[in-house]
């Protein structure tokens, strides 16, 4: 029974439509202009398209401006479709014609869905951070404290996925059999072997080089602040401080293709502890040891020493020292919303226990969080002011 009128609870209808208190439950659309003729649904109140117009999505358009039915999906005029691997772009043109052309993503782009639309978009990056005793924040954000003192693969391609590079690190004991830290880094790619050693010494294919250097097209090595920075055209960047800290940044185009101590970069932490044989294990020591690389120049004991235990008093002191990372109103608060500090706080407490409350190591751990914040786009300024650093 009609109850609305122009002055009582009027229903505003969009252009090219009108209010109908009992319109068909199967309105004519660009996909099915004959829908009302075979409709068994009861009539409904709503906005019906004016004669000569058809429903395209939620808009009434002239029949001549209807879109395209393509691969069982309807597209309005001007809308486009990209296939699953972004090699074809099809656009709905006038008169219902879908016109397709070849598509290729750029070198710094990846094929993905963004805001509901598949296409070629700028590749994001993921960071793996290695520092301290050592601690590994994987590409997917999982923290582990593998204490091996040998040579290990931190990132390489999984199985048959060729990413074109491999990064290994040598660890060594520092002052205690239960304390190890990163000593040097090696990058292998396209016939190059780049070694980043202590005190920021750099070797390319065995020869010591001065910085900046460009040993191959698309590969640059330079000093940037406190780090030796290696940039490659393969979507890999390294930053090594010449002591204990390494930042490994990879392009999104490598997502799902990586393995090593930096994890799998699949978007899930569940498979980060994957061994070279493809088996995911729960124990990080089993996982870490599986990535050991034979190295005649780096004799080591593959046995993993347990970490030093911390007494309640020592743990309380460590928590107090490291709380500056999580303190609201402290120098690191501006970064909290972008990069939660909890894993860095946990690593800091771990290191304070392992080193007997070393001030130097405390400052190393605070600096590691500051470096990660900088990579995330948060500049903390002189964070060390007012601290023991």
Task: Give each language-model segment a name.
Residues 1-389:
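Extracellular/secreted glycoprotein ectodomains characterized by long, lumenal stretches
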């Amino acid at each position: 029974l009609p109850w609305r009128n122009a002055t009582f609870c009027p229903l505003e209808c969009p252009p090219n439509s009108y209010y109908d208190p009992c319109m068909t439950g199967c309105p004519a659309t660009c996909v099915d202009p004959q829908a009302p003729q075979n409709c068994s649904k009861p009539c409904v109140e709503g906005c019906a398209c004016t004669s000569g117009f058809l429903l395209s999505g939620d808009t009434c358009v002239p029949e001549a401006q209807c879109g395209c039915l393509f691969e069982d999906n309807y597209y309005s005029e001007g809308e486009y479709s990209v296939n699953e691997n972004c090699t074809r772009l099809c656009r709905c043109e006038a008169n219902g014609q879908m016109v397709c052309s070849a598509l290729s993503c750029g070198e710094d782009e990846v094929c993905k869905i963004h805001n509901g639309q598949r296409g070629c978009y700028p590749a994001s990056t993921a960071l793996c951070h290695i520092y301290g005793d050592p601690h590994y924040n994987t590409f997917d954000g999982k923290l582990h404290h593998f204490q091996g003192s040998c040579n290990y693969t931190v990132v390489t391609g999984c199985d048959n996925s060729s990413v074109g590079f491999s990064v290994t690190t040598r660890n060594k004991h520092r002052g205690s059999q239960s304390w190890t830290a990163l000593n040097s880094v090696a990058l292998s790619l396209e016939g190059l072997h780049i070694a980043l050693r202590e005190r920021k010494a750099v070797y390319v294919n065995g020869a010591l080089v001065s910085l900046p250097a460009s040993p191959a097209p698309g590969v640059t090595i330079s000093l940037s602040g406190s780090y030796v920075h290696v940039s490659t055209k393969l979507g890999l960047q390294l930053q090594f401080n010449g002591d204990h800290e390494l930042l490994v940044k990879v392009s999104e185009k490598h997502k799902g293709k990586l393995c090593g101590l930096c994890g799998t970069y699949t978007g899930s932490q569940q498979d980060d502890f994957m061994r070279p044989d493809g088996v995911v294990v729960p124990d990080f020591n089993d996982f870490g040891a599986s990535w050991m690389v034979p190295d005649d120049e780096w004799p080591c004991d593959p046995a993993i020493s347990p970490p030093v235990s911390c007494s309640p008093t020592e743990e309380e002191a460590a928590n107090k020292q490291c709380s500056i990372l999580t303190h609201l109103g402290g120098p690191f608060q501006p970064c909290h919303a972008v990069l939660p500090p909890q894993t860095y706080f946990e690593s800091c407490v771990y290191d304070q226990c392992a080193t007997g409350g070393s001030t130097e190591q405390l400052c190393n751990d605070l600096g590691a969080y500051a470096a990660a914040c900088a990579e995330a786009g948060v500049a903390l300024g002189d964070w060390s002011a007012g601290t023991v650093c």
